[in-house]
Amino acid sequence: MQIITTTFIQKVILGSHQLHEQLSIVEARMIESAIVSMLTESFCENEQTLKYLARLLSPMSYMDVINARRGKKICGYPLCYKSAAENSSDGFFIHSMYCNNYHSKCSLYLMRQLSQTPLHERRGVHLTSYINLEFDDMYSVSLLEELVGSEVPIDTVKSLITSFKDLEFDDTYKNEPLPLDVYFGQLTTDEETCIE
C-alpha cells in the first residue's frame, strides 16, 4: 500500500486546479473521484494529512471512500492500512467496514464533522499557494485520537459519550469492550478535566 502525504495531495490531485478560486462542478467531481481512487489502495501518512484531506470531503464522498476500501477488504478508516474484520454468518464470511470498533467510531466521528457544502461551492479551499485562516475554521476537523490523547474538558467528554450511543454503524465488535469506553466509564462528574 502507498502512503499518502499532504504534499502528494497538493501536487497530484490539486496541482492542475490552481488557476482559479472557484471549482466547477466537473473539477470538484474530478477531485473527489481522485481522492476515492487514491484512498482505495493507500492510507494517510498521519493525522495532519487526514485533516487536510477532510477539507475536501463531504459525508457522501467520505462514504464513497469507506465503501471503496471495503470492496478491497481494507479498514474504512483512511489512517489505517489493516484488513477489515470478518464476521461469520450462516457459514458465509462477511467483511466489516473496519478492522475494529475503535476505528469505526473514529471514522464516524470524523464523518459527522465534514461539511455538507459541495466542494464546488467551497471557494478557494483547494488552493495550495496560500493559507486562508477562514478555511481552517470553516472546514477544520478534529480526530477522535486527538481528543483521547489530550486534556479534554469534562463537558466535551460528556457530549462525546452521548454521541457514541448513536454510533452503531458497524456492529462487528458490538459486544467487545472498547478501551475508550472503559476510559470514559472511569470519569466522575466532579472532575473539571480528564487526562489520559
From Swiss-Prot:
UniProt function note: Probable RNA polymerase II subunit B1 C-terminal domain (CTD) phosphatase that regulates RNA polymerase II transcription. May have functional redundancy with RTR1.
A GO MF label: zinc ion binding
Documented EC number(s): 3.1.3.16
Lineage summary: Eukaryota, Fungi, Dikarya, Ascomycota, Saccharomycotina
Catalytic activity, as annotated: O-phospho-L-seryl-[protein] + H2O = L-seryl-[protein] + phosphate; O-phospho-L-threonyl-[protein] + H2O = L-threonyl-[protein] + phosphate
Alphabetically ordered keywords of this record: Cytoplasm, Hydrolase, Metal-binding, Nucleus, Protein phosphatase, Transcription, Transcription regulation, Zinc, Zinc-finger
Protein's recorded name: RNA polymerase II subunit B1 CTD phosphatase RTR2
Misc. comment: Present with 1050 molecules/cell in log phase SD medium.
Locations listed in the record: Cytoplasm; Nucleus
GO cellular-component term (any): nucleus
Transmembrane helix among keywords: no
Zinc finger feature spans (RTR1-type): 52-123
Residues noted as binding Zn(2+) in the record, renumbered to the chain: 75, 80, 99, 103
EC supergroup of this enzyme: hydrolase
